[in-house]
C-alpha cells in the first residue's frame, strides 16, 4: 500500500511538472525526457522512471516510444498485467523490437500463450536476423504444451543462428515440458559443457531433476542451494511415509529425520525468504501428519491456511489431522476443497467418506464410497502383458463400502457384501477383519473369533489383526492375556486411535459396574387388584473381574404398592458370585428380605450359548422376586423355577420360548409359558423399526381362591412395534429416542375378553464406554378379573462403570 501511494504521488508531481512547462518545450524535449526516465530506471529508480513515463502519456508528451519504454520497464519490474495493459492501449502497429520482446514475455508471464505466440511470430517476420524470436517462440509453445511445435521451431535456420547455449537451453526446456527427462538431461548436459559449467545453465539442468523428485541429483549438478535443500527435505518426508522399516518400533525413523531436517532449514532460513519458508512449512505439516503428531499438524494447518489456500497435498494432511482431532466438519471442508479442484482425488474422497461417517451423514458416506467403488476397474492390465490381474484397489473399496453399512448399523447388508467378497478372495485379510467386526455386531462370538484368527494367520504383524485378537480375549474374559497383548501395542503404537479405544474398553471392563433401575407408577381401576401408587426398584453392584472369570456382586431391591388392603413393601438385599467363561455364565446368591414380610431367600442362574444362534437359560429362586406384593400381606410367598430357550438368527430376528413354575406357600401352583418373536422391519442409518408378537398363558391350581390376583387360566396375544431413532451422536456419545407401542387381546377364564396395550417413550443416553442412562414415561392398560386398570409409569435406569 505504501508503495502504491508513493507511486501515485510521484505520478502526480510528474504530471504537475509537465503541466507547468510550455507546450512547445514539452514537445521539443519528449525524447530527452523519455531517455532521462530510462536512465533513472537503469540507476535503480524504477518507480520514479515509470511514473515519469506515465505522466508523459497522461500529458500528451510523446515521441512515439514513451509507451513502448513503459511496457519494457513494467515487464522488467515484474508487472506483466500493467505492461500488457499499456501495450494494448498504445496499439502501436510497428513496435520496436525491444518493446515487442517485452510484451511477448509479459503475455507469457500471464499465461496468455496464444497472444505471446502471435507476437513472437510477428517478431520473427519483422526481425528475421534476430535469433531471439525463434527461441522465444519455442519457449512460449513449450509453456502452452505444444512441445512438438516448439522443437520444430528450433530446427529452423533462424534458430540455428542463435548462440548454441541459448538454443540448447530452449531445446532442453521443450523436452522438460514434454516430460522426456532423458532427452532434456542430454541437451542440458551439452549446454553445460559448452558454457563451461555456467551456474545458470547448471540450475536449469537441475530443475529437470527437481521435476522428477531427484533433489540429490540436482544438488550434484547445481550445488546445494536453499531451494534444492528444501526439495531434499520434501523428498525425505515422502520417503519417510512410503518406505518404512518392517520393525514397528522404527516405522517413524525416516519421518523423524525429515522433521529434523525441516526444522534445521527453517531455523537457518532468512526471514525475507517467505516463499521457501511456506514451502518448508507445508512439507512439515505433511511430516507431522505422517508422524501422527496430529495436534501439531492441526495447529500448523490452521496457521498456514490463515495465510492463504493450501495446495492439495498439504490440504490432505490438514484434513487428516482435523479428522483425528475430532473436528469432522472442518475435515470435510478441507477434503471438499481438494475435490473442488481434483474431483477424482482418491485420498480426498476416502477422507470425505470418513468425515461423513463421523458426522453420521450416511447418505453422503454411501454415495461417496459407492461412486468410488464403481469407478475402480475390477481388473488391471499392464503394458506388454496380455493377462488380466486383480485390482486390489477395487477390493479395498468394495470392503470399505460394506463397512460403511456396518458403520450405519445395517449389519445384514454389510454381512452379505462381505461374505460375497470373502468367498471370492478367501485370503484377503482386510475382508476377514471386516467380517470379524460385523460378526461381533450381529452377536455371533464364535464366528467372530474364527474370522479374527484367520485374519491374524494371514497377517500376524498387522495392527488390525492384533487388535482383533485382543478384543476376542476380552470377550472371552481373558483379561490378563488381553492386558499383556495390549501393553505391547501401546508401547509400539501409542498414537493409534484404535489402540487407545481398546485400552479404554479394557479399562472399562475391569471396573466396578453399577446397574440401577427405578419404576414409579400410579394406577387407577383394577377393582380389588388395584396397585395404586407403586414402585419397583432394583440395583446391582459388580466387582472388577477376579482371576478373570469371577465377579462378586451385591444386589438390592425395593418395591411397594397400595392395594385395597393397605400399604405393602418389600426390601431385599443379597450378595453373590458370578462365574463367566466363553459361552457360559452362572451365578449363585443368598438374599434377605424385610418390610411387610421378613424372610431369607436366594437363587441361582445359568446362561449357556450353545451356538452363536441358540441360547439356553435356567434359574431357580427361593422367595422369588416375582412373588405378588399383595400376597406378602397374608404371609404368602412363592419360589420360582424358570427356563428359556432362544434362537437368534441375527440381531434382526429371534424367537424365544419361556417356561416358569411357581409353587406358592398357600398351596397354589402356577405354571406359565410364553412365546416371543421379534423381527426388525426397517433398518436404515439412525432409525430402526422392530416388530414383536408375543403369546403368554398361565394356569393356577387355586385360581380365583387366593387374596392376590390369580386367574385360573389366562391368555394374552400381543403385537407391537418398537421405533428407535438416533437423535444425536458425537463419537462416543449419543442420544436415542425410542417409542414402543403394543396392543392385543387378554382372555381370562370366567371373564369377558378385553384389549390391553402399552405405550412407552424413552430417551437413552450413552457416554461410552462408562455410562448409559435412560428415562421414560409409560402408559399401560391391563385387565384383572374383568376390571380395567390404567397405569402411568416412569422409568429411570443407569448403567455406570466406576
Regions found by a protein language model. Name each.
Residues 22-69, 76, 85, 230-233, ...:
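N-terminal leader/linker segments that initiate helical-solenoid repeat arrays
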Residues 29, 72, 101-102, 118, ...:
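Gram-negative and organellar
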Residues 64-105, 109-111:
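Mid-chain, structured segments of secreted extracytoplasmic proteins
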Residues 1-11:
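Bacterial N-terminal signal peptides that target proteins for export
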Residues 9-20:
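Bacterial N-terminal signal peptides
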Residues 47, 78-85, 523-530:
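Inter-helical turn/loop elements of alpha-helical hairpins
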Residues 18-23, 608:
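Short hydrophobic alpha-helical membrane-anchoring segments
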Amino acid at each position: 500500500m505504501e508503495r502504491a501511494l508513493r507511486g501515485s504521488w510521484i505520478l502526480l508531481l510528474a504530471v504537475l511538472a509537465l503541466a507547468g512547462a510550455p507546450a512547445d518545450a514539452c514537445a521539443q524535449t519528449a525524447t530527452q525526457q523519455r531517455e532521462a526516465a530510462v536512465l533513472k530506471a537503469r540507476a535503480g529508480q524504477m518507480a520514479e522512471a515509470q511514473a515519469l513515463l506515465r505522466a508523459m502519456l497522461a500529458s500528451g508528451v510523446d515521441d512515439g516510444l514513451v509507451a513502448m519504454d513503459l511496457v519494457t520497464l513494467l515487464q522488467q519490474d515484474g508487472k506483466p498485467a500493467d505492461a500488457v495493459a499499456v501495450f494494448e492501449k498504445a496499439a502501436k502497429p510497428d513496435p520496436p523490437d525491444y518493446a515487442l520482446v517485452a510484451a511477448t514475455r509479459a503475455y507469457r508471464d500471464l499465461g496468455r500463450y496464444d497472444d505471446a505466440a502471435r507476437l513472437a511470430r510477428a517478431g520473427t517476420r519483422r526481425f528475421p536476423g534476430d535469433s531471439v524470436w525463434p527461441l522465444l517462440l519455442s519457449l512460449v509453445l513449450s509453456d502452452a504444451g505444444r512441445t512438438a511445435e516448439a522443437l520444430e521451431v528450433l530446427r529452423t535456420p533462424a534458430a540455428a543462428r542463435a548462440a548454441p547455449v541459448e538454443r540448447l537451453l530452449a531445446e532442453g526446456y521443450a523436452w522438460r515440458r514434454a516430460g522426456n527427462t532423458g532427452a532434456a538431461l542430454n541437451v542440458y548436459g551439452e549446454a553445460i559443457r559448452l558454457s563451461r559449467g555456467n551456474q545458470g545453465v547448471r540450475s536449469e539442468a537441475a530443475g529437470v531433476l527437481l521435476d522428477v523428485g531427484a533433489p540429490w541429483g540436482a544438488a550434484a549438478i547445481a550445488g546445494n542451494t536453499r531451494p534444492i535443500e528444501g526439495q531434499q527435505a520434501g523428498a525425505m518426508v515422502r520417503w519417510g511415509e512410503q518406505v518404512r522399516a518392517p520393525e514397528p518400533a522404527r516405522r517413524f525413523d525416516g519421518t523423524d529425520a525429515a522433521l529434523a531436517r525441516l526444522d534445521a532449514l527453517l531455523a537457518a532460513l532468512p526471514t525475507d525468504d517467505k516463499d521457501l519458508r511456506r514451502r518448508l512449512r507445508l512439507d512439515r505439516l505433511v511430516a507431522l501428519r505422517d508422524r501422527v503428531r496430529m495436534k501439531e499438524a492441526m495447529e500448523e494447518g490452521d496457521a498456514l491456511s490463515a495465510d492463504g489456500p493450501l495446495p492439495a497435498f498439504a490440504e490432505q494432511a490438514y484434513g487428516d489431522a482435523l479428522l483425528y482431532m475430532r473436528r469432522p466438519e472442518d475435515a470435510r471442508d478441507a477434503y471438499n476443497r481438494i475435490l473442488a479442484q481434483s474431483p477424482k482425488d482418491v485420498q480426498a474422497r476416502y477422507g470425505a467418506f470418513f468425515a461423513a461417517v463421523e458426522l453420521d451423514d450416511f447418505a453422503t458416506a454411501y454415495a461417496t464410497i459407492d461412486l468410488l467403488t464403481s469407478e475402480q476397474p475390477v481388473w488391471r492390465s499392464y503394458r506388454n502383458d496380455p493377462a488380466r490381474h486383480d485390482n486390489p484397489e477395487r477390493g479395498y473399496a468394495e470392503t470399505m463400502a460394506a463397512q460403511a453399512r456396518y458403520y450405519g448399523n445395517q449389519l445384514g447388508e454389510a454381512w452379505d457384501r462381505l461374505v460375497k467378497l470373502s468367498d471370492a478372495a478367501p485370503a484377503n485379510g482386510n475382508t476377514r477383519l471386516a467380517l470379524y467386526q460385523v460378526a461381533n455386531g450381529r452377536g455371533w462370538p464364535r464366528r467372530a473369533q474364527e474370522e479374527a484368527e484367520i485374519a491374524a494367520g494371514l497377517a500376524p504383524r498387522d495392527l488390525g489383526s492384533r487388535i482383533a485378537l485382543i478384543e476376542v480375549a476380552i470377550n472371552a474374559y481373558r483379561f490378563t492375556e488381553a492386558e499383556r497383548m495390549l501393553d505391547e501395542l501401546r508401547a509400539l503404537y501409542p498414537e493409534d486411535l484404535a489402540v487407545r479405544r481398546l485400552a479404554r474398553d479394557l479399562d472399562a471392563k475391569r471396573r466396578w459396574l453399577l446397574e440401577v433401575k427405578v419404576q414409579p407408577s400410579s394406577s387407577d381401576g383394577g377393582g380389588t387388584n388395584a396397585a395404586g401408587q407403586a414402585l419397583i426398584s432394583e440395583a446391582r453392584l459388580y466387582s472388577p473381574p477376579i482371576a478373570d472369570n469371577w465377579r462378586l456382586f451385591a444386589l438390592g431391591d425395593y418395591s411397594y404398592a397400595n392395594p385395597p388392603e393397605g400399604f405393602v413393601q418389600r426390601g431385599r438385599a443379597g450378595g453373590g458370585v458370578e462365574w463367566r467363561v466363553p459361552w457360559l455364565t452362572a451365578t449363585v446368591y443368598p438374599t434377605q428380605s424385610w418390610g411387610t414380610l421378613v424372610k431369607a431367600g436366594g437363587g441361582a442362574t445359568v446362561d449357556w450359548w450353545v451356538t452363536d444362534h441358540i441360547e439356553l437359560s435356567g434359574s431357580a429362586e427361593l422367595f422369588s422376586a416375582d412373588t405378588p406384593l399383595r400376597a406378602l400381606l397374608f404371609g404368602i410367598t412363592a419360589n420360582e423355577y424358570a427356563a428359556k430357550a432362544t434362537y437368534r438368527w441375527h440381531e434382526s430376528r429371534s424367537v424365544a420360548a419361556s417356561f416358569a413354575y411357581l409353587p406358592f406357600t398357600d398351596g397354589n401352583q402356577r405354571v406359565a409359558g410364553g412365546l416371543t418373536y421379534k423381527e426388525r422391519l426397517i433398518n436404515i442409518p439412525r432409525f430402526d423399526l422392530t416388530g414383536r408378537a408375543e403369546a403368554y398363558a398361565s394356569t393356577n391350581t387355586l385360581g380365583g381362591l387366593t387374596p392376590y390376583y390369580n386367574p385360573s387360566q389366562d391368555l394374552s396375544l400381543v403385537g407391537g412395534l418398537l421405533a428407535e431413532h438416533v437423535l444425536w451422536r458425537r463419537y462416543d456419545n449419543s442420544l436415542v429416542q425410542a417409542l414402543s407401542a403394543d396392543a392385543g387381546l387378554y382372555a381370562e377364564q370366567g371373564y369377558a375378553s378385553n384389549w390391553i396395550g402399552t405405550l412407552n417413550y424413552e430417551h437413552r443416553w450413552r457416554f461410552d464406554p462408562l455410562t448409559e442412562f435412560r428415562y421414560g414415561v409409560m402408559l399401560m392398560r391391563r385387565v384383572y378379573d374383568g376390571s380395567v386398570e390404567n397405569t402411568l409409569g416412569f422409568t429411570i435406569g443407569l448403567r455406570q462403570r466406576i
